[in-house]
Regions:
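Domain-level signal for Mg2+-assisted phosphodiester chemistry and nucleotide/NA-binding surfaces
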Residues: 2-108
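Nuclease catalytic cores that cleave nucleic-acid phosphodiester bonds
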Residues: 97-151
Length: 151
């Protein structure tokens, strides 16, 4: 895996690595709760706006920045349910957009059967941090799985 990501990815100074399944679940929770409060339907979250918010929280400011967004997802999940664009292969992987913060390029990687999700995520995070070009890393990941008490 490490060689695959090293060969496939053009490293940017700024990298966002996100557990796509987790952010999709968080978006679902927010949408459901706010729909109840305001009494109307809320559309899926805009991926570009979400990425902008993460970048701003991570210290990126307006300018000609390059940001690599890496989405890690379950291999059985082809798309997120609560974001647009949502399909990992068709809409996100290899795509990019440019706005006032810079250019955001997307890569998505499914977690295959032979590896645990947490191990895969850590391997990719270690690979990112080992790249000399990378100066800023923003990580979005559920650190502990929910227990019965959390549900």
């Amino acid at each position: 895996m490490e060689n695959n990501i090293r060969n496939k990815v053009h490293w940017s100074e700024n990298v966002i690595i996100a557990d796509a399944d987790h952010i999709d679940n968080v978006a679902f929770d927010l949408i459901v709760n706010f729909e109840r409060m305001i009494g109307r339907r809320i559309p899926p979250a805009d991926m570009a706006k979400w990425v902008d918010c993460v970048a701003l929280d991570g210290g990126i400011r307006e300018g000609d920045n390059e940001v690599l967004v890496i989405l890690i997802h379950d291999r059985l999940k082809k798309a997120m349910d609560n974001f647009v664009p949502a399909n990992f292969q068709k809409d996100l992987d290899g795509m990019a957009f440019k706005d006032h913060l810079g250019e955001f390029s997307f890569s998505s990687y499914p977690v295959e059967e032979m590896v645990e999700s947490s191990d895969f995520f850590i391997d990719i995070l270690n690979t990112i941090c080992a790249q000399k070009e990378v100066k800023r890393v923003m990580v979005i990941r559920l650190l502990t799985p929910p227990t019965v008490r959390d549900i």
